[in-house]
Amino acid sequence: MGLVIFVAGRYLLWPPQPPVSSTPATAPGETPVTVSPTTRPASEPDATASSVSTKYGGILRLADRGDPPSAFDPMRTSSIALHEVAGALFGPGNLVMRSRENVYQVSPYLARTWYSSPDFTEWTFVLRNDVLWHDGTPFTAEDVKFWFDLALFGYEVDGKIRAPAYFKGELDAIEEVEVLSKDQVRIKLNTRNRFFLEILADPRLKFAHPRHLMEPRLKAGNVSVSPLDIGLVGLGPFRFEKYEEGSVVRVRRFDRYFETDGQGNQLPYLDGIDYIIMTEPAAMDAAFRTGRLDGGARGVGHYLSEERMQGYIRDLGDRVFFAEMEGGNFRLAFNVLKPGPWQDPRVRRAIALWIDKEAAIPSVLGGFGWTSPGLGPLNPGKDKRFVVWPRFDTAPLEERRAEAKRLMAEAGYAEGFVMGHISRAQQPLGGQFLKDQLKGLGIDLQLEVVDEAEWNTGRVSLDYDSQQGALTVLPIPEGTEGVYGRFSKSPDSYAKHEDTKVDDYYRLLLEASTTERRIEVWRQLQEYIFVGQTYVIPIAEAIYVVPYRTYVKGLPVPAEDAHTHTDFATVWLDKSVK
């Protein structure tokens, strides 16, 4: 696995890699309507002549950037501090998952096959019959219905209310989940959606709520019951063993896990994983370089900068490799539901024109990022025609800033104003960059630096004037309503608005029958959000870099979205490599 480094205006691969053959990927959304494989080969990017027996065993030691928040509940947070652990406990997907071989394709997971109605408004899933919860209870269609109902509608008993999942907006088209038999469920949608599988394959949507353990507690009035309260009983390749707050999360192999590799050998290979909680990136770097870690943490702040990566290369040479993934977008988003000058679209537009986007790459993204898709890392599976935002606002910075000043004066704010901004303590560089940038426009950006607990609740509230957002956009346009949609449908959306025209664009996307029409509508939608209304200002695309020891083998590295493939079921430790 190589690393793409931005040097002298272009990207270079380090270390140099031999040519690798690849199978052309199908376009997102072009998966067959009916799929019925019984096995799925595990990713083996580091195949050797080692016998299968040598792959088994060992404890993988990974850094985690913080304690998993929200009592380990994936319905309450998308934090990577949870989801780096959640993949091992709860699995890499739900009914379906992103393929380990190609993140843009959908593979079976808990469902072994599925089919849709001709108009894509009904999807029927046939479940595997060999899936067990970690306490030995069989997984059934009743678990599926329970999870979807809990995520979509929450729960109410004796006047106590449990809120729906934060990602409800992604699944808002679901009208009903019907149990057909012990191993079959039918999901009915209120609109056609031939991309429903790709949306469902979002790795944040994890089954962490076993009906047989959760439902009795809910009926008894404990509407806040969490996965931690019931012992973190999941469906993933590893079972929960121990959690010491501020120290470590330990998981160990679940011997009755259902997945096998391409040769029929049971997964996972590892005996277990220890997630060492390290809130300081410097502590992680020191632990890795002194042999106390096998892999770094995922998460902004802990991803390597160019300077930190050079330290790894200097000290470890060929004993380290770097997993590189396209990350999320560094952005500024507005709460237009809160009174203030930012409710005027001219003001928001002025801010978008004023920001020097390229300056964010070294200042905020550690040197790894891009503002033009032509400069991004090689990614043959991604259709760059859907990468629209860099094509807006391409005039020279001086011209853009002159127009920004004019718009501010026209809106009556030539002297500027004060605007609040919720900023994560774990990643202060973004907030400081925005504050420094907007000072020249006369805007005093008041940074409200918060811990992870307040960040996870504050960003889904209407309490703050602006924010950077947290979620990584799904790889397909149809899966982005959860981050660009209306607040009432998607509380974790970047901007807080109630613009029904955005709903109309997503409806047109779902109705599109050709790739060309999808691209056309997607461009119109992005132009509306980023330019016409400027609810969100995309600034630069991040490239996430995570270090691993070279003896870590079988690691599927997603082309984008670091929440993907955190189950580590196919990972093994090559004992012949020191």
Label for each model-derived stretch:
Residues 44, 238, 368-410, 427-429:
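Structural transition elements
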Residues 97-101, 201-274, 280-283, 401-402, ...:
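Gly/Pro-rich hinge or "lid" segments in bacterial periplasmic/extracellular proteins
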Residues 548-578:
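Long beta-strand-rich cores associated with HINT superfamily self-processing modules
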Residues 157-160, 164, 241-252, 276-338, ...:
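Extracellular/periplasmic solute-recognition and catalytic clefts
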Residues 325, 341-383, 429-430, 528-538:
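Periplasmic-binding protein-like
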Residues 340, 349, 361-364, 395-398, ...:
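Extracytoplasmic/peripheral linker and loop segments enriched in polar/acidic and small residues
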